[in-house]
Curated annotation (Swiss-Prot):
Protein name: Tol-Pal system protein TolB
Protein source organism: Photobacterium profundum (strain SS9)
Subunit structure comment from the entry: The Tol-Pal system is composed of five core proteins: the inner membrane proteins TolA, TolQ and TolR, the periplasmic protein TolB and the outer membrane protein Pal. They form a network linking the inner and outer membranes and the peptidoglycan layer.
Functional note: Part of the Tol-Pal system, which plays a role in outer membrane invagination during cell division and is important for maintaining outer membrane integrity.
One GO term describing the cellular component: periplasmic space
One Pfam family hit: TolB_N
Gene this chain is encoded by: tolB
A Gene Ontology BP annotation from the UniProt entry: cell division
Annotated HAMAP family: TolB (MF_00671)
InterPro entries named in the record: 6-blade_b-propeller_TolB-like (IPR011042), PD40 (IPR011659), Tol-Pal_TolB (IPR014167), TolB_N (IPR007195)
Signal peptide: 1-22
Keyword Manganese part of the UniProt annotation: no
Keywords: Cell cycle, Cell division, Periplasm, Signal
Amino acid sequence: MMKRWMMGLCIALLSFSQIAQAELELVITEGIDSARPIGIIPFTWEGEGKLPTDISSVIASDLQRSGKFSPIATSKMPQTPDSEEQIDYRAWTAMGVDALVTGKVTKNAEGNYVVNYQLVDVVRGQLTSGESRGLANGELVLTKDHLLVNNRAIVKETRLRQYAHRISDVVYEALTGEQGAFLTRIAYVVIDDKSKHPYQLRVADYDGFNERLVLKSRQPLMSPAWSPDGSKLAYVSFENQQAQIYIMDIYKGTRELVTSYPRHNGSPRFSPDGKKLALVLSKTGSLQIYIKDLKTKKLTQITSGRANNTEAFWDPDGKSLIFTSDRGGQPQIYRVNLADNSTKRLTWQGSQNLGGQLTPDGRYLVMVNRSDTGFNIAKQDLKTGAVQILTKTFLDESPSIAPNGGMVIYSSVNNKSNELSLVSIDGRFKARLPTTNGRVRAPSWGPFL
């Protein structure tokens, strides 16, 4: 199933401005019942009115969406302490909760917010009654081994939600040993048939908040891809009656034309160091993979022959590419070594496999797999060859992996409209990101901020 490319003409370039339409909002569909219980205590606000951002709610939502944690509802909490000294450890362990996040927010004289928060090991706190004894310089002293995190920060009002995501990352890493991906962004294309500019390239926080309109066009926009530093997006637009590849600086609002060869220009993908761009051209006939050096402008052809080769994705070490090819009759995923152009087929299970991406550690291949059940997101262990179908949604496409490798965002069809969905890399947790003002396609998960 190769991508179908449509013709376009006019494009309008916008500043990186916020849009007023309904934002994406995650809806949990599966996976929470088996997750680890955790207490995210409502942060105490020692100020007038309401806190502009409900920090504890953001943290709870982040951890819930990871699929690994199940925050306790506030109504079921035995208490709501704002520091570890106030915790009733027995009450929490009786609920099966082994970790708590507590916090307090105040406002300083400059009008900024002072956020104090703690991550507490409840089990260890119960065993030591909140205090343990250890040796320091040969003397017995009280320690706080149960206090896993104890941080303080001064935050501007406009940064409160961002800092809440940062807290989520800290908590997630402390409890799992893996880096969190909550302070990240996604890019995607929205198709709003009721708009004068129906094709829109947007960027948002991973959870759909702080959505920004980057670009709008009367003609199709496709295949957004992030630069490694998160400052640029490569994408395909249809100007001058053909597909063209551009790179846009999302902060400056400037863009550069990268390729405009006859016929097809598509599937741009930055190299891990950001110095090159893998792309697909058909200037010699069939679709072929090329690499363009963004500094020297040198173009190197990687694949050749009569078959169509497309959807290139870089190996994390930058030494090879995976790509989709129909050289065997149906689309399957291959790997090409850039040193000698040797090629190996990777996928064998399913009549078709396409849209492949690699997890950051290079261990797993995530792709669209076609079987008797349709087109679904699947994961293949590149060491063992084992394949796991991750989704049960309809007509899945365009998977994109979180920078920590823990989640996959993709496009699917629900109620006859394209929308974005999330699935954990183990397939146990699923969520949907519905939108009310258009079809959402071609998601791309950005790098760590």
